[in-house]
Amino acid sequence: DDPESKSHGQLISEIYAHLNKQQRNEYFYMNTLLNKLLCGIHNVNTTSAFSQVRIGHSIADFVMINGEGRVYEIKSDLDNFDRLYDQLRYYFCAFSKVSVLVSIHELEKIHEVLASFGDMGDAVGIYVLSERGTIFNKERSREPSIYNEFLNHSSIFKMLRKREYENIIRAYFGVVPQVEPVFHFSAFLEKFEEIPIIEAQKLAFQEMKKRNKITVEQFQKIQPELKAVVYFSGLTSKMPALDQLLKIQYRG
């Protein structure tokens, strides 16, 4: 077909369909996961999702926070499991529930790999992206278990923005440390460490969840193939302009 007879939106849909058939990369996994979680199981009014969250020396592919926090590590067919142990260990420093999302071709392998990780591996959830694009198939999935062996205040605290940890300390203690700017971070971390770890984690998640500014109506209007791009880039305010661009005929 002549691409110049189609709109930008139509071409993006065709490229995405090609990815689905030929090369399901990390974006395809992430976008599918976001669509399934925020359009199906949860909704954007009660749930916030984040991508590329730094935890220790690793970066979590996908984090979801509603009443609890969950990490999803994406392993597409283009990835391997060489660094998985270290990645999971870092994630468990801040989160109690961690899962791995793999392709159907890697299902047997991921069970073997996680089994070699001992108790930590046993706690990790397993989800599978099927050929039909489903993820939460009960027969193939394994729900994550709570695992707090590595949970620590510092890892949780370092995910927070300045305003967020200030809100937590002010709400919990009624006062905030009065220190020179150079000591600000360490003084607030010291107070944060006085909060019981599970409570500290809960308060951190409550603050992080407030970052989500998109409504259900706005989210539903985003072209399915572009939901992750718009959601994680904070482009909500530019959606009218994006909608117009997607309707314009491609000119080469």
Whereabouts are the PLM-identified features?
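Active-site metal-binding core of divalent-cation-utilizing nuclease and nuclease-like domains
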Residues: K21-Q23, Y27-G67, L114
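Short, flexible loop segments at the rims of nucleotide/cofactor-binding pockets, characterized by
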Residues: S48-S51, I74-N80
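Catalytic cores of nucleic-acid endonucleases
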Residues: L78-G118, V124-Y127
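A conserved mid-domain beta-alpha-beta active-site/ligand-binding segment of alpha/beta enzyme cores
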Residues: R132-N212
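C-terminal, charge/polar-rich interaction regions
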Residues: E190-G252
